[in-house]
């Protein structure tokens, strides 16, 4: 069994490599994303909180290439590149955390409901239908407003309440297909426990789909966090975010006369999300190919 899993993992890696070789856009996107994450997190490691909290009015709204500021400064006299790195790190952290929770909850519930089916599955699916029709954005905004001592963890928890539904339904649908395959029937006949069948036999066969889903969920979470922060309902006040940087564009004067304060963040979000989507589409094709050949 261990040798078989090892071969499957090698086959998965090989399939992904081959797809990336064929899809040059996905390959370039992968290299670009790795570079972005390395630059953002390594750069952030060497910054102190005072670097992006302290205000220097004398350097307020300096234009790019002025006094050593390559992209200029913001309304607090802080370097735009520095703020961009910190903001990107914070936005990525929120997206990573929500994506992790989404995948864990979505995979567990999806495999369980898809495996057992029956009345439990019916009731659970009606519950997810109800949650999906709720105005999640409005509810998140309400929670952000009323929760005392709101912080980054609060935001992660609130977003995660609604984020697992899509992943659960996707994993459930694929699990229901796997349940009817011969290897599952053979395991049931041999007396293998339901837990082992679900998470040692079925779930590994969904790994490509899970990876593809993770990339797309991550892209969506970056967009959601950015949107909430742009509206003023994201990260706590004083915490830099790509959304709060873009919020500078709501000031007509800043939007037209000082575009360097918000354009860099907009460009970063656009390119990063597009790169993730290109990678996700390539991984989804790998998942579909592996499913078709089984």
UniProtKB/Swiss-Prot annotation:
Residues 88-280 form the ABC transmembrane type-1 domain. InterPro entries: BP-dependent_transpt_permease, MetI-like, MetI-like_sf. The chain crosses the membrane at residues 27-47, 94-114, 127-147, 151-171, 202-224, 260-280. CDD domains: TM_PBP2. One of its GO terms (biological process) is transmembrane transport. The keyword Protein transport applies. Disulfide bonds: none annotated. Keywords: Cell membrane, Membrane, Peptide transport, Protein transport, Transmembrane, Transmembrane helix, Transport. It is found in: Cell membrane. The keyword Iron-sulfur does not apply. Belongs to the binding-protein-dependent transport system permease family. OppBC subfamily. This is Oligopeptide transport system permease protein OppC. It comes from Lactococcus lactis subsp. lactis (strain IL1403) (Streptococcus lactis). The lineage of its organism: Bacteria, Bacillati, Bacillota, Bacilli, Lactobacillales. The gene is oppC.
């Amino acid at each position: 069994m261990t040798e078989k899993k090892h071969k499957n993992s090698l086959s998965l890696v090989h399939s992904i490599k081959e797809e990336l070789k064929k899809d040059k856009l996905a390959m370039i996107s992968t290299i670009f994303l790795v570079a972005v994450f390395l630059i953002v997190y390594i750069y952030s490691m060497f910054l102190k909180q005072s670097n992006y909290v302290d205000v220097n009015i004398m350097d307020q709204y300096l234009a790019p290439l002025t006094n050593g500021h390559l992209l200029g400064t913001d309304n607090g006299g802080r370097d735009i590149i520095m703020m961009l790195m910190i903001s990107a790190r914070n936005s990525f952290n929120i997206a990573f955390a929500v994506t992790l929770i989404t995948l864990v909850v979505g995979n567990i519930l999806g495999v369980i409901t898809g495996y057992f089916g029956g009345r439990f599955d019916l009731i659970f699916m009606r519950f997810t239908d109800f949650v999906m029709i709720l105005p999640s954005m409005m509810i998140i905004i309400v929670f952000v407003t009323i929760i005392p001592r709101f912080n980054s963890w609060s935001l992660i928890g609130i977003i995660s309440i609604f984020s697992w539904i899509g992943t659960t339904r996707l994993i459930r649908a694929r699990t229901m297909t796997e349940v009817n395959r011969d290897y599952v029937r053979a395991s049931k006949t041999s007396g293998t426990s339901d837990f082992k069948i679900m998470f040692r036999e079925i779930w590994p066969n969904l790994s490509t789909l899970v990876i593809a889903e993770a990339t797309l969920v991550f892209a969506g979470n970056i967009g959601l966090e950015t949107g909430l922060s742009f509206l003023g309902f994201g990260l706590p006040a004083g915490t830099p975010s790509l959304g709060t940087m873009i919020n500078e564009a709501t000031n007509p004067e800043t939007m037209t006369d000082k575009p360097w304060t918000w354009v860099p963040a907009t460009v970063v979000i656009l390119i990063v999300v597009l790169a993730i989507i290109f990678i996700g589409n390539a991984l989804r094709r790998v998942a579909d190919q592996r499913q078709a050949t089984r």
